[in-house]
């Protein structure tokens, strides 16, 4: 991908996306994507207190996402947000390719586009949905019945 192609794609994609994702078990998880200051996309899911993963730091979560989890924080509504970024080894970092400066790193690799990051967010949401307290209760009751 050359500079012009990347510029066009970034302009077409925009800098953010938000949606509600309904997981295969019926749990609804809010997802979002934001472009960071280095122009790489970052994906996030929002967990409510109904999820047993609520408040647990990303280093302590056994969840898989592109490059591993790299973010956690409470949002303005006191929900727990966890996320990942697409600025890892083997990722094309848009800033380094589009910059006027000459960099020897970050210019090769694969650009992780909005569709890729959306898919990763939804995979992360599916994993986290298993820890919804309502799903955990349902599974326990199903084993008893």
Predicted regions and their residues:
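Short acidic, low-complexity intrinsically disordered linear motifs used
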Residues: 133-145
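Eukaryotic compositionally biased low-complexity/IDR segments
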Residues: 1-4
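Polybasic, proline/glycine-rich intrinsically disordered low-complexity segments
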Residues: 6-27, 54-133
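Generic structural signal for residues positioned in beta-strands
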Residues: 32, 44, 81-85
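Acidic (Asp/Glu-rich) sequence patches and key acidic residues
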Residues: 34-52
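Intrinsically disordered, low-complexity regulatory segments in eukaryotic proteins
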Residues: 32-33, 134
């Amino acid at each position: 991908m050359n500079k012009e192609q990347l510029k066009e794609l970034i302009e077409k994609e925009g800098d953010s996306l938000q949606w509600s994702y309904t997981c295969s078990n019926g749990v609804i998880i809010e997802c979002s994507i934001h472009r960071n200051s280095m122009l790489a996309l970052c994906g996030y899911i929002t967990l409510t207190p109904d999820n047993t993963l609520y408040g647990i730091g990303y280093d302590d979560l056994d969840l898989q996402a592109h490059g591993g989890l790299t973010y956690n924080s409470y949002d303005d509504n006191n929900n727990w947000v966890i996320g990942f970024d697409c600025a890892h080894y083997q990722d094309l970092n848009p800033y380094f390719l589009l910059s006027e400066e000459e960099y020897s790193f970050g210019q090769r690799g694969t650009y992780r586009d909005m569709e890729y990051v959306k898919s990763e967010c939804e995979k992360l949401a599916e994993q986290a949905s298993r820890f919804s307290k309502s799903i955990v209760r349902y599974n326990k009751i199903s084993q008893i019945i």
